[in-house]
């Protein structure tokens, strides 16, 4: 009986934590807690008309504004509480999330350059474009 109680308690602690995933599949919407996200931006997948319905599009670019693929992405709310963390193999990350003020941060998986961060609010209509620009690699 004690083992079952401990397992239930451990499950509740995990459920209360950050919604996280390892690498998420390309061009496939997934739900992480209150956040729906899509990793895309490569090849024909980026032209899917569904992606225009997402209110937030985060683009990963280098110092010359060329798309970069592959980053560990973190999303937090206005209090700094982590809402989602995952690895994206694409150069775009789309979000559908409740109204509010958020911070998105990305760290390139194949480079030691400084992470890029931006604060944003989802628009009431349309799509906002957030560009995370990474400095030139050393």
Model-inferred region functions:
Residues 90-96:
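Short, surface-exposed beta-strand/beta-hairpin micro-motifs centered on an aromatic residue
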Residues 77-81, 97-100, 122-125:
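A short, structured loop/turn motif at beta-sheet edges
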Residues 100-106:
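A short tyrosine-centered beta-strand micro-motif
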Residues 21-71, 75, 108-138:
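Primarily secretory-pathway and cell-envelope proteins
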